[in-house]
Amino acid sequence: MKIYAVREPVFSGPTPSFQNVSNDIPLVIDNGSWQLRAGWGGEKDPKLVFDNLVSRYRDRKLSRTSTLVGNDTLIEVGSRSIARSPFERNVISNWDLMEQVLDYTFLKLGIDRMEHPICMTEPLANPTYVRSTMTELLFELYNAPSVAYGIDGLFSFYHNTKPSSSGIVLNLGNAASHVIPVLNGERILSEAKRISWGGSQSSSYLLKLFQIKYPSFPIKMLPSQAELLMHDHCHVSSDYTHDIAHALDRDILERDEIVLQFPYTEAAAQEKSQEELELIAERKRESGRRLQAQAAIKRKEKAAERDRELATLTELQQQSLVLSRRAFQRALEEAGFEDESQLNAQVKNVQAKIRRAQRDQQRQEESEGSLDVTEIDVEQAFPLLNVPDAELDEAGLRQKRHQRLMKANYDARVRAKAEKAIEEAAEAERAEADERLRLENFSTWVNEKRETHKILLEKISKNKRLKFELNDRKSHASQMRMKSLATLASEQPIQKRKRKDQSEDNFGARDEDWKVYHDVLTAEQLEEERKKLLDQIYSLEKQLLEYDSQFTQANTYDTLNDPRATLLYAFTRGVSDFDVNDVAQAFQLHLNVEQIRVPEVIFSPSIVGIDQAGILEIMRSILQRHSLEEQQKLVSNVLITGGLGSLPGMETRIKRELTSIMPVGSSINVFRASNPLLDAWKGASEWSVTEKFKAAKVTREEYLEKGPEYIKEHSLGNINS
């Protein structure tokens, strides 16, 4: 696993300025949608290379608006994000921005008056309106003496091959890609094809893939960062079907995965001494003891209050025996009751609260190990229980009621202790029988344990799935639960007096009847059931690991359900152990599948929903239109040019695919341009000093006579449509 810092475009310094040259030297401009290259004809390298962007940046402190062009958009922090391109796809759409780019170009080249012939590149099948507008701009605004246009991909082919060569140009540009056949030095534009995919779409696609892969990533990835990532770390797969199937294998991830580290700020942790830690722990314990004491006091107060309330209500009930009906009704109204039934209901309510409080106290005592009940003499501990009420005064009656509650609590604890002893004895008996079976018939014991383990895994899987579905009200499980609840709620209660023709309710006679209550389980009840199943699974796995040699750690529940073993974890976190507390890992992206998925679109545009053929299908279609001899000429020079063509593995993949469709023994030569980014300009520079350029350029006089749409056709340019 390799970790790389995410690169960002940086300002490398102001663009240098140059002196003007002789007027007879052509000005060569490679006007690309990504970068513009400009220089003088006949030279080996361009003078200017900058991004084809314009930014109007306003400095709020100085109250000044600046127009920044090219690499100068990186001077200010916020200017790059608002920069715009004159191009839409690979066609010029904003002529105001294009004019500012040309002004900047001529200014840096030292041209104060345009007296140089211009050689400018354009894309394949450039719309006539766009070319005529550019011609009008150069002649009317800049007073250019002459202009000639040529296709950028063909200029690159001109630079990298001999004159009158045959071949296929794969121009993988920034906004689109083109496949152009060339036979005996002449381009065949009627067979050329365009694919609506290039470098800008690839980087945008990579950015979207990361946004989907890491929806809650703490930092927003910029398009410029995605562009650099695509060029730095993506490559073309020689066998995409095989590689994508094994891209998430552990050994492949360890070898090829790339981790991208974004900048982060780690909060400085304040380290505490051992004494401070002990003091904090003691404070927490003291606070816990204080809260427990307060809770105990509140419980006692509430219990005493309920006892007093119950005594008052019981005394009011007993008054019905000695008072007249009218006097008793008056006493009820004074106590806030409408009738005797309301009084009885309140008595039952208070008694229920007292019983719940006793059960809660009993559970708390059981959790604290208070099931070790010490046997006591009931008559001595609760002497008032056998004394008649008539022999006791008011204080004695209250004490008797308190002893009755204490006696009930004591009896419940004794019963719980007895039940626990019975359960422990039964468990010991089952364990003894299980051990006897293991010693006497090991194969049967192992098979039973494996089958039980399989059943428990299925149960907990079903529990997990059901719990997940219950969170969705529209899921089938939620709808069935509500249906069961509605069925239970709609059942009519049984009347006290049965009619002769009324059949007796036999619900519960079958075991299946009780499954209806399992169908209406809540998420909390499912969680309790899951915990019980886990306890059984862990206990069973402990035995299997100890005695079954075929049952290994890889077969355990924790290993099978380890998120690090899932495909999703490998996709998002690779082979690393992700630590949620590690700030550095929270700012990391893992580049694995995307390394080959993004470049593959040029071969299969359907991956991103583009209904077009890939470059290999287009090449096959072109070759099928020619004779075998011409096919051999075309595949003898397959040139890859353009920014997207600089990705590693492109030549190997194309040669492999061409080998599969060409006859055995065919001479196939696939090569990358010496400089895929600059060779279009270099080819135009070489061509601009030949006689062919002089014959192909349109002079100012011809422009005035024949209009802006007039061009002269030549072997490296578009046709006049």
Curated annotation (Swiss-Prot):
Coiled coil found in the keyword field: yes
Gene3D superfamilies: 3.30.420.40, Actin, Chain A, domain 4
GO annotation terms (biological process): chromatin remodeling; DNA damage response; regulation of DNA-templated transcription; transcription initiation-coupled chromatin remodeling
A Pfam family it matches: Actin
Any one GO CC term of the record: nucleus
Family statement: Belongs to the actin family.
Protein name: Actin-like protein arp5
Lineage: Eukaryota, Fungi, Dikarya, Ascomycota, Taphrinomycotina
